Amino acid sequence: MAGVSSESLTAALVALEAKLPFASLQLAKELFGILGTVDSSAGLRRALTDPSRSGDEKSALVKQLFGGKVSTDAAEIASGLAGSRWASARDIGDALETLAASVVIAVAENKSAVSASGITGLEALENDLFAFNHAVDSSHEVQRALSEPQASPAAKIALAEKLVPNASEEAKVLIGQAVSHPRGLKATNLVRRFAELAAKRQQRWIATVSVTRPLTESQTGRLQAGLNALYGRELKINMNVDPALIGGIRIQVGDEVVDASLLTRLGQLQRQLAG
């Protein structure tokens, strides 16, 4: 997805972010359901991506089709997409799929640690998705069964759940979507895409810290506390030592490089680390 479609998807993801702390699997299932309706009707896809129709007109069409049949949030998200600009009829479906998967991923992220080892819901989701793909890749028979056009979606979902019986509910939703509605892809390729979305969200909360020399335990603790305060949650720190680094320290959280102004907001972090 590129150009105007990419811009529309980015805007939709930004708008979705406000709903994610309270996201539910039901919302994701509703969005996947809307996607199924859109994918099943070439006429509807054309209507929703027709550049000659106004955004308000296309949004109203979605509200007319789905109002009262899905939650207010689902209808709002779908109508927002319809009111945006798309380069191709396929792109709006791809965007719906991405938003629905993002909701599932957020539900997993919102879970607290789920095991004695401290693994998070997001990590568990990624592990389950990888386990499913490994199970499929290890069996030609399973691959044939999942690609059999005569097999029902329900049968494929049942087979998938047998492959990863202990998977989280979030993983089951994404895997079920991939095997029942792969949208022209191999199911494992779509699951891999979902895993990449989860990994990207996980990366947002990893601080990669490059320093010219190893930090002491005390310095690392102050750095951790400062970053946690800045981002409003506990970050995982990956420490790299680079003697050639200019400036003594470089911090990157997800796609964001923590610049001098942010370091100042951390309470003169550089001076603290030097102490």
Curated annotation (Swiss-Prot):
Top-level division of the source organism's lineage: Bacteria
Q: What would be one Pfam family of this protein?
A: OSCP
Mind listing the UniProt keywords for this protein, alphabetically?
Answer: ATP synthesis, Cell membrane, CF(1), Hydrogen ion transport, Ion transport, Membrane, Transport
Q: Which GO terms describe its cellular component?
A: plasma membrane; proton-transporting ATP synthase complex
Q: Name one GO molecular function term.
A: proton-transporting ATP synthase activity, rotational mechanism
- List the membrane topology term(s): Peripheral membrane protein
Subcellular localization, as worded in the UniProt entry: Cell membrane
The UniProt family comment states:
Belongs to the ATPase delta chain family.
Q: How does it assemble?
A: F-type ATPases have 2 components, F(1) - the catalytic core - and F(0) - the membrane proton channel. F(1) has five subunits: alpha(3), beta(3), gamma(1), delta(1), epsilon(1). F(0) has three main subunits: a(1), b(2) and c(10-14). The alpha and beta chains form an alternating ring which encloses part of the gamma chain. F(1) is attached to F(0) by a central stalk formed by the gamma and epsilon chains, while a peripheral stalk is formed by the delta and b chains.
Q: What does this protein do?
A: F(1)F(0) ATP synthase produces ATP from ADP in the presence of a proton or sodium gradient. F-type ATPases consist of two structural domains, F(1) containing the extramembraneous catalytic core and F(0) containing the membrane proton channel, linked together by a central stalk and a peripheral stalk. During catalysis, ATP synthesis in the catalytic domain of F(1) is coupled via a rotary mechanism of the central stalk subunits to proton translocation.
Which NCBIfam families does this UniProt record tie to the protein?
A: ATP_synt_delta, PRK13430.1
State the PANTHER family in the record: ATP SYNTHASE DELTA CHAIN
The name on file for this protein is: ATP synthase subunit delta
* Natural source organism: Arthrobacter sp. (strain FB24)
Q: State which gene encodes it.
A: atpH
